[in-house]
Amino acid sequence: MSEKHRGAAVAALLLAVCPLAAQPQGQPKQPPQPMSFFVTSTGVGNGANLGGLAGADAHCQKLAEAASAGNKTWHAYLRTQAAGNQPSVNARDRIGNGPWYNSRGARVAASVADLHGDTIEAARLGNNVSKASVFTEKNESIKGFGDQPNQHDILTGSLPDGRAYSDGADHTCKNWTSGSDGTAQLGHFDRTGGGNTSWNSAHPSRGCSQENLVSTGGAGLLYCFAIN
């Protein structure tokens, strides 16, 4: 074997035994992105009566602060309908611009358009909201379809595109102030029964009480997004 061939053989052997030697050195590992999205570990406790948008946002903020993420401003992913002199509010318009990351540093969506599948490509791919990537502010998994109890229903009041209904019916339990009469549109964080769009708009609740929400597979939980 020539000196040239012998050198090549030794180099190949070293790479096989010590593959790390082939990797570039001096590249520090990037720290994980801080949490900017979670599902609440608990509901408010009064069904869909959240105290309006302000009460829902305060619930997200309180849980985030307890998880050492209170340096951000948190909003609940909720839609309201026009009432009195107040116009409707789209859920997609109150959560900032993204990107958003879960409690383990994985990206859930790059932007509002990515989150809602506004383009054909984004709609085909879907966002990263799923049972494998959605966690609470405590970095805990949530019980979904097939678990006991099933708690995959998430309050949203929203159409799949994150916008408001135009049919005049109540989809928000009286703009999140009723714990009895009315109904609320629910999403499935695990996307069972509805494909890519079911994360935020799967079916209506049976009512607005805590018992009503539990009966269809929920616990009055919310999506929380950091807006900054």
Show where each model-derived region lies.
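A composition/secondary-structure signal for short, hydrophobic, low-basic-content segments
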Residues: 1, 19-21
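Bacterial N-terminal signal peptides that target proteins for export
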Residues: 1-10
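Bacterial N-terminal signal peptides
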Residues: 10-19
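Secreted/extracellular ectodomain signature
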Residues: 23-228
